[in-house]
């Protein structure tokens, strides 16, 4: 892959253990990411803020005060939540960044059709002044076991291009999935415009599903427990 792909280091599997978060910070990841608001709080309170903190799921409405206070950027796929998030960011006098998610068959999250995603992008860009549209993304290999392919990655790239044409500027990020997208990035089949991946499993365990690169260590974590 000839372009730079940034990494969001996902720490939910280790409960945002400060020692591991610090390693991620030092490794040069773009974001520290988790799906747990409680873990965002742990990192904030521990001063682990060298990198922007990312929430990698759509939040509940009741969580929005914490989402704005504790994270810098979040994945979003519902216009009602986006509008409420904007109001909360306004109350806290903050600009919160969002990545709009597109569902490409996995059914975990995201707008189901491109028209809805385009409408949401235009509303964020032009009307929701306390939100900043940072990019678009997709989640795969989760609920529906739809794996990353050149075809669905290109569909995401096409959506990004359509949004960029409508808003008149380039998006910062086109996020092409998580650990299961690593093989495409490493074997040169990832479309050029994909520039952010969210790595949890492959960063911690050195492998993901059936993909196990030789250059990644598989023994960096040891679980110790007392047997009763």
Segments from the language model and where they lie:
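Acidic (Asp/Glu)-rich catalytic clusters
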Residues: 2, 22-26, 44-49, 68-69, ...
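N-terminal active-site wall of soluble small-molecule enzyme domains
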Residues: 2-71, 184
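Short, well-ordered coil/turn segments that N-cap beta-strands
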Residues: 3-7, 28-31, 49-53, 71-72, ...
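Conserved, mostly hydrophobic/aromatic
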Residues: 12, 43, 67, 78, ...
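Active-site-adjacent beta->alpha loops and helix N-cap segments on the catalytic face
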Residues: 18, 40-43, 80-94, 145-155
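Short, acidic/turn-prone active-site loops that include or flank metal/cofactor-
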Residues: 36-39, 57-62, 79-81, 102-104, ...
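A generic, well-ordered mixed alpha/beta core segment in the N-terminal half of proteins
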Residues: 64-107
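Active-site loop/helix belt of alpha/beta enzymes
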Residues: 97, 103-224
